[in-house]
């Protein structure tokens, strides 16, 4: 507009006089003020004023307000057209025809007004302005409405394309402290803001900024939880949140535990099975195939790959999603997740799950006991899977496993490289042996049961079922009183009859036997047969229990009984020294003296440890063999230690070996009667039932003719030089940290006449462990544990063992598949 005024003034000054120039200048100044008033009215809020211009609002505020009140509002085009028409009219009256021609030439380049007749001579500006006032006002209002609608649409597109989350990403909706405003409140505020913007005449760009700020502030949670709260791994989507609002009864069934969010009901359209899953630490969850090791990042890819390892006829597929499995209970657990059924509820919190194993794992979170500890470092954990991962990663060894109450449980074995979940029990290692041993024939009476009862059994009594050596010490001890009470009357009657028939020399031994009967049966059994081998890890508990029982009984004995015991030992020692004409009798008497000294003077001294090789080679238990006139048999055992036969399959009498071996390290033998010459009177002995442990006769055999049997039992050893030498099974006893094998091997000369009376049986001997087996299955199972390169290395798992005892302990404690 200033350029137009300048051009007009230059043209007028060239053709007019000074008087006309002054009038024109005054008119231009009035027009300039009017133009600035209109210009500021239209664009004062949006366009910055130039430094040289004068704002009419500051110079004439009252005049401007009165003028705005009196005059109606016009559109920008109408105001500009009226202003130019008035300006040209003034120049037409003052300038004449020449000036009009020049103005027409200059105005040809300008934009004509729609109400101006450029080619005509008559300019009716006032009439045209008054007639076009109402249409121009309507056009201005219509333009303003269209402009506001377009601006609102742009603001909505901007907000929808950059919609804020509405919650803190670390504390998404669903947490108890997150409070979001209601959606209806948000929409009501938005409608009020739109109505207020419609009342504004001129739109402003600041309205969009304030609108976006108000929307973002309305969606921000008012009470944000603290940042130290661990967020869930997968927040709920908006659609799921709306579904939970519509069905509050279904929402109550869902547990608020973060672990349950992994099992949100999946469907074919759920993105959780097609997209990778990230945990709270930002780490992506991988799905590893147990068959080939393939790693998938989505459930969909993992299930597709799992199909390749399954047989088509065994595939079980979920009807709601692509989940596949071969196990029926896995499909059942998966369907429970779809139905949101969690029948297993924790009794200490609100946690619920779909199966029992998940509940057991959760219950450990409430316990303060760390069951699994590493033996090589300070690592401790509550979960077996984490413990196995630690052992595999650092190649460490597991320590003692605790039970749920924090008590050490040595029967639990950690299979580090196994695929089976959870720990294993040691009893599983002996399942094959127990099954094979169940097929063996059990003798009519058991040596172990007879010894545990603490009194001799007559042939007329009912056969007793053998006590299993795999029982614990507490269960065996609980059976002892019942066995003793049931047969106490028969024992007393048998002792009275025997005392009437006994010789004066045998009555002294009867008193010794009565003293031994005072001891607990288990203590008496282990005291008289120290090398009797139960299972290696079970024998120590029995010895400790027997020592406690024996100490308690000896503490209650009177001084007279103790003196009687010492006197009997001295008498035996004198008799043994007087009988040096035979070497075999000397060895038996020396062994008896050594054994009685240990058993009487010390209450089951466990500090002596495992017997040495010299002690193992001596026939400690040959003193307990009994003689009988009714059976013409030779003893199975003798004192010769050089008659061992390793690696040979021996043929022995079935009667002599029946019940002699039960399991690999638990030898028991039937009663082997010796047929002696007529040197022994037939009236000094009574029939004896063949049920005695190898060498256990002091507490479980007949009291008659015991001393005479010792003196005359070996006179016939050399009368048959053509008999075959046989070897018996060795016995092994281990305690705690002992790794040396305790084995004895004895041989005897069998009578040819008695060997032909009964069928022969085959004996299998392990030359590495000095153990005999009657059954080929047991022998095969046992030899399968010996490795070819190293006989004491386990052939199943490759673990190196220290001797035969270490190998037996390893076989008993570790489960082998």
Curated annotation (Swiss-Prot):
Any Gene Ontology CC annotation: nucleus
PANTHER family associated with the record: HOMEOBOX PROTEIN BARH-LIKE (PTHR24330), MEDIATOR OF RNA POLYMERASE II TRANSCRIPTION SUBUNIT 29 (PTHR24330:SF19)
Function field: Gap class segmentation protein that controls development of head structures.
Chain intervals with Polar residues compositional bias: 103-119, 680-694
Record bears the keyword Transferase: no
Originating organism: Musca domestica
Start and end residues of each stretch annotated as Disordered: 51-77, 93-132, 187-252, 456-477, 491-513, 564-619, 666-758
Protein name: Protein hunchback
Gene symbol of the encoding locus: hb
Main location: nucleus
Family: Belongs to the hunchback C2H2-type zinc-finger protein family.
Acidic residues: bias regions: 577-595
One MF term in the entry's GO annotations: DNA binding
Biased amino acid composition, Low complexity: 62-76, 189-201, 564-576, 721-758
C2H2-type zinc-finger residues: 287-309, 316-338, 344-366, 372-396, 764-786, 792-816
Subcellular location: Nucleus
Record has Cell membrane as a keyword: no
InterPro entries: Mediator/Homeobox_domain, Znf_C2H2_sf, Znf_C2H2_type
């Amino acid at each position: 507009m200033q350029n137009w005024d300048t051009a007009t003034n230059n043209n007028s000054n060239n053709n007019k006089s000074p008087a006309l120039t002054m009038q024109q200048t005054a008119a231009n100044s009035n027009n300039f003020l009017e133009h600035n008033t209109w210009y500021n009215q239209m664009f004062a809020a949006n366009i910055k004023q130039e430094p040289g211009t004068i704002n009419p609002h500051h110079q004439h505020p009252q005049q401007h307000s009165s003028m705005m009140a009196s005059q109606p509002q016009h559109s920008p085009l109408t105001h500009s057209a009226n202003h130019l028409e008035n300006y040209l009219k003034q120049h037409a009256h003052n300038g004449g025809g020449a000036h009009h021609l020049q103005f027409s030439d200059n105005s040809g380049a300008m934009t004509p007004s729609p109400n101006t007749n450029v080619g005509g001579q008559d300019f009716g500006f006032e009439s045209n302005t008054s007639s076009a006032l109402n249409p121009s006002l309507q056009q201005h209002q219509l333009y303003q409405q269209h402009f506001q609608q377009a601006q609102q649409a742009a603001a909505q597109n901007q907000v929808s394309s950059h919609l804020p989350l509405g919650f803190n990403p670390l504390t998404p909706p669903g947490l108890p402290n997150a409070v979001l405003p209601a959606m209806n409140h948000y929409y009501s505020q938005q409608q009020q803001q739109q109505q207020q913007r419609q009342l504004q005449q001129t739109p402003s760009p600041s309205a969009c900024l304030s609108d976006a700020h108000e929307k973002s502030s309305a969606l921000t949670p008012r009470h944000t939880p603290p940042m130290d709260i661990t967020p869930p791994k997968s927040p709920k989507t908006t659609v799921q949140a709306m579904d939970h609002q519509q069905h509050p009864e279904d929402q109550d069934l869902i547990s608020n535990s973060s672990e349950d969010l992994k099992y949100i009901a999946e469907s074919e359209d759920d993105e959780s099975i097609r997209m990778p899953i990230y945990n709270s630490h930002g780490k992506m969850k991988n799905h590893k195939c147990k068959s080939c090791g393939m790693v998938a990042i989505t459930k969909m890819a993992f299930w597709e790959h799992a199909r390749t390892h399954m047989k088509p006829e065994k595939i079980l597929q979920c009807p709601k999603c692509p989940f596949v499995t071969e196990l029926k209970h896995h499909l059942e657990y998966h369907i429970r997740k779809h139905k949101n059924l969690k029948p297993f509820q924790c009794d200490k919190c609100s946690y619920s799950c779909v199966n029992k194993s998940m509940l057991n794992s959760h219950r450990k979170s409430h316990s303060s006991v760390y069951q699994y500890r590493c033996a090589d470092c300070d690592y401790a954990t509550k979960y077996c899977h984490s413990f196995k991962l630690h052992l595999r990663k650092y190649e460490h060894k597991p320590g003692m496993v605790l039970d749920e109450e924090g008590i050490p449980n040595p029967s639990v074995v950690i299979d580090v490289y196994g695929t089976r979940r959870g720990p294993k029990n040691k009893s599983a290692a002996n399942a094959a042996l127990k099954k094979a041993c169940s097929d063996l024939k059990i003798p009519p009476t058991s040596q172990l049961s007879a010894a545990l009862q603490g009194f001799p059994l007559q042939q007329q009594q009912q056969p007793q079922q053998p006590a299993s050596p795999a029982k614990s010490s507490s269960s065996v001890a609980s059976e002892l009183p019942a066995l003793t009470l049931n047969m106490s009357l028969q024992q007393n009657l048998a002792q009275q009859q025997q005392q009437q028939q006994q010789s004066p020399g045998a009555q002294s031994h009867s008193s010794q036997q009565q003293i031994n009967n005072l001891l607990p049966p288990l203590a008496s059994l282990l005291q008289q047969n120290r090398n009797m081998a139960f299972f290696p890890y079970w024998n120590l508990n029995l010895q400790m229990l027997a020592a406690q029982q024996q100490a308690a009984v000896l503490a209650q004995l009177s001084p007279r009984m103790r003196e009687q015991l010492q006197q009997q030992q001295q008498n035996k020692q004198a008799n043994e020294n007087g009988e040096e004409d035979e070497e075999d009798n000397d060895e038996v008497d020396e062994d008896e003296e050594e054994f009685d000294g240990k058993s009487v003077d010390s209450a089951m001294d466990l500090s002596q440890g495992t017997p040495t090789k010299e002690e193992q080679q001596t026939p400690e238990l040959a003193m307990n063999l009994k003689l009988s006139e009714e059976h013409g048999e030779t003893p199975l055992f003798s004192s010769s230690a050089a008659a061992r036969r390793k690696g040979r399959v021996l043929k022995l009498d079935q009667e002599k070996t029946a019940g002699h071996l039960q399991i690999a390290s638990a030898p028991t033998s039937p009663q082997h009667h010796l047929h002696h010459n007529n040197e022994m009177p037939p009236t000094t002995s009574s029939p004896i039932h063949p049920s005695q442990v190898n060498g256990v006769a002091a507490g479980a055999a007949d009291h008659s003719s015991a001393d005479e049997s010792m003196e005359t039992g070996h006179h016939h050893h050399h009368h048959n030089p053509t008999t075959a030498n046989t070897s018996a099974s060795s016995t092994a006893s281990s305690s705690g940290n002992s790794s040396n094998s305790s084995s004895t091997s004895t041989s005897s000369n069998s009578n040819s006449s008695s060997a032909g009376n009964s069928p022969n049986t085959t004996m299998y001997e392990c030359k590495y462990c000095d153990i005999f087996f009657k059954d080929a299955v047991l022998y095969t199972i046992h030899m399968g544990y010996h490795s070819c390169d190293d006989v004491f290395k386990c052939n199943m798992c490759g673990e190196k063992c220290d001797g035969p005892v270490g190998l037996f302990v390893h076989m008993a404690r570790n489960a082998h598949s």
